[in-house]
Amino acid sequence: MKFIFLLIPFIYSSFVFGFTINQDMGGFDNNNVNIEIANSDCSGAGFSTSKYSTLIKDAVEEYWNSVPTSALYLKVVGINTSIDIDGDQFSAAINKAKTGTILAGCNDDVTDFTDGSILGAAVATCDSSACKSVLILNAHANSSLKNMSDSEIKAVIAHEIGHAFGLGHSEYKHNLMYYSIGGKTQKWLGIDDIDGATYLYPHDAEIAGLLGSCGTIKDISKHKLKGSNNSIFRFLILFLIGLLISKFILKTVLSNRDFFNKFMK
């Protein structure tokens, strides 16, 4: 019996550590984040720029804007005809993003995009005032996107949007932010996805303190995934909470030993 209760703090503290945070960013300052679409050619990916806009809107509504515990709201403001990221590497493309926004586009010139299994990537940067991000899908002639269904492409887009607003990868396959979607259709968010979005953009700031690549979506965004030090700290806190819970339960059981002995028989 004591052995069972000793497991409680370990089990309790293990539930919330699947998501990681992009240390280069840590989230936008504002819960309401606009997504602008660059007026770049997406034909290599198998769709028009207009269709790309629709896919992003659908991805936003079907995934991230549907998290009830998160205050994050992503608004697709449409195609900005004055922005074109064709020919740009990420370092140049992100300079075209407005502060506090995500710029989404297609490109066949990013160095790693000659590998068709790399479907896209996202980069975020912050300074003393605010953050901005750029999301680019692979529109190279070799891109595997042209062979994917709309549902799969929306999952790819939603995955990269997750990076763009501050999430890293999850190690568990049932989550959208798992490092490889492997061509499957991810129709919903997993618990790590939900916890990560809630941690970064909670309705109540106090709630955050209680929470404890893809083919391949390759992480070429130079993410330094934060999780080691913070995860250890959160693990210790939650372990102690679990220990207190197990102590309370054990005390209750011992004080009612006769009843529980009859029950266990």
Set out the residue ranges of the language-model regions.
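Positively charged n-region of N-terminal signal peptides that target proteins for export
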Residues: M1-I4, K265
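Zinc-dependent metalloendopeptidases
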Residues: V16-M264
